Structures are given as C-alpha cells and as structure tokens.
C-alpha cells in the first residue's frame, strides 16, 4: 500500500489534535475531490515498517487524540489488508487513542463490500468513528464538522456495529 503523507498535528479530520494517514488510491473520483493527487494507488511512498514506526511515534504523545485514516480511499480492495494491519497495531500499542476513518462509500455499501482477504467490516470494527459518503459539490457546507458535504455522516462505528444500524456520532 502506498500513502501520500502522514500529517502529525491535524485538527480538521476528527476530534482533537490528530495524526492523519493519507493513503493512496481511490476509484470513486468524486467531482470536486480535495485529494485528487491521492487517487492514483501508485502515488506516494510504500508504507513500510519505518512508516509504521513513524506513525506510532507521532501518535504516542499525550496531546494527540488519535489516528484518522483518509485518502485516497482506505477501503479500496488493495488497501484493506494493510489498513487493517495498521489499525490493529495502533489499537494494540496505543489503546487509548481513537481511530477515525473516512470512506466515500455509504456505511451500508461498505458493510456489503468484499475485498478478498480482509473485508471493510474487519477494518471498520477497529474504528471508533467512520465518516461516510462521497463528497458532493452541490451539497457542500463548510459549517459542518469533519465533513465537506451534507450527505456525509459522522457515524459511531462501534455502536452501529453492535445495534446493526447507523448511530450518528454527531449531526
């Protein structure tokens, strides 16, 4: 899996000061995407053991609330296995950190997807919050917290999986 960058002090992609892993590759090509450079899966750098160490070191600070995974698209079939391994490692090493994930798919679509090995459900099961839905330029709303358009939802992933229905983290 390739990634574009690791942002170490982000306040726009989840609650608190966060580390953001921007993965490469997205087949959705949403019009108006603010990360068009991340759509090509071959863009950026290979995520290696050194990248993992950098990520853990960045997260292991008392003022960092957690990790956000965005892109590109973390749930692309060619990213699922690696993203799962990364989230599993973060959960094990730093269990108090929250994990947010952005997906262009609706929650219901993501739960039905098949990626071969690791499924999107496996990845989502390690997340606290999932922001779902493709960016829609005609629904752009800069007043919304943590998302760009009104069709996107901020979902409490753990409670939604438990109740088998979407439970919003916030409106």
PLM region spans:
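N-terminal [4Fe-4S]-dependent radical SAM core
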Residues: 1-22, 27, 35-42, 166-167, ...
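P-loop/Walker A phosphate-binding loop and immediately adjacent motor/lid segment at beta-alpha junctions
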Residues: 83-91, 140-171
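Short glycine-rich, flexible loops that bind phosphorylated cofactors or substrates
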Residues: 76, 138-139
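Short cysteine-rich clusters marking metal-coordination/redox-active sites
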Residues: 30
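Conserved Radical SAM active-site core
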Residues: 2-3, 17, 35-120
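Receiver (REC) domain switch/active-site residues of two-component response regulators
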Residues: 128
């Amino acid at each position: 899996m390739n990634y574009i960058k690791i942002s170490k002090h982000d306040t726009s992609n989840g609650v608190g000061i966060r580390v953001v892993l921007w993965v490469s590759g997205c087949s959705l090509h949403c019009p108006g995407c603010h990360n068009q450079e991340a759509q090509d899966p071959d863009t950026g750098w290979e995520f290696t053991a050194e990248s993992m160490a950098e990520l853990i070191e960045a997260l292991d600070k008392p003022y960092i609330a957690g990790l956000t995974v965005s892109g590109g698209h973390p749930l692309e079939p060619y990213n699922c296995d690696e993203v799962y391994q990364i989230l599993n490692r973060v959960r094990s090493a730093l269990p108090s950190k929250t994990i947010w994930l952005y997906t262009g798919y609706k929650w219901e679509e993501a739960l039905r997807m098949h990626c071969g090995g690791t499924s999107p459900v496996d990845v989502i099961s390690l997340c606290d919050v999932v922001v779902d839905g493709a960016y829609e330029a005609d629904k752009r709303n800069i007043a919304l917290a943590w998302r760009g358009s009104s069709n996107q939802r901020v979902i409490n992933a753990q409670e939604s999986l438990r109740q088998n229905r979407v439970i919003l983290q916030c409106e």
